[in-house]
Regions:
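ATP-dependent carboxylate/acyl-activation modules
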Residues: 1-133
Length: 133
């Protein structure tokens, strides 16, 4: 095949559809004044529209990450609000801690965004991730 013919081919990425769950954003950035800062908020467009976020300086422990969840104005959504399933706070807390540790231990990373992360009754799943160096 010539290069020209190969560049005309369409490529697709097909992935299994993830089940519904509560969507959050987990992120961190190396701030020039504060150092590694970790963010948690509602995911998708809600992160930008509502501004309901919690911030902490890394490193974080599990208790710090759990407190970030409680700090959200929307924290009731994690507890089975209006009959929705109760979310796995412990699994989300582990992701929050891990993202903080990655930014803390990797000076070349300026920013990490996991958005959305779906939180389920058992476990979490990052559906999209961006790392900026």
């Amino acid at each position: 095949d010539s290069i020209k013919s190969r560049t005309r081919r369409k490529r697709y990425l097909v992935e299994e559809m993830a089940p519904p769950g509560l969507e959050v954003i987990v992120g961190a950035r190396n701030d020039s004044s504060w150092g590694p800062v970790v963010l948690l908020g509602l995911g998708g467009v809600a992160a930008e529209a509502l501004g309901d976020v919690s911030l902490r300086l890394a490193p974080l422990g599990i208790d710090d990450a759990l407190a970030m969840i409680d700090d959200l104005q929307s924290s009731a959504l994690f507890d089975g609000f209006r009959g929705a399933p109760i979310c796995d706070r412990a699994a989300l807390a582990k992701i929050i801690v891990a993202v903080g540790n990655i930014v803390l231990s990797t000076p070349g990373i300026r920013e990490i965004d996991l958005n959305p992360v779906r939180v389920y009754p058992q476990g979490v799943l990052a559906l999209d991730a961006l790392i900026i160096r």
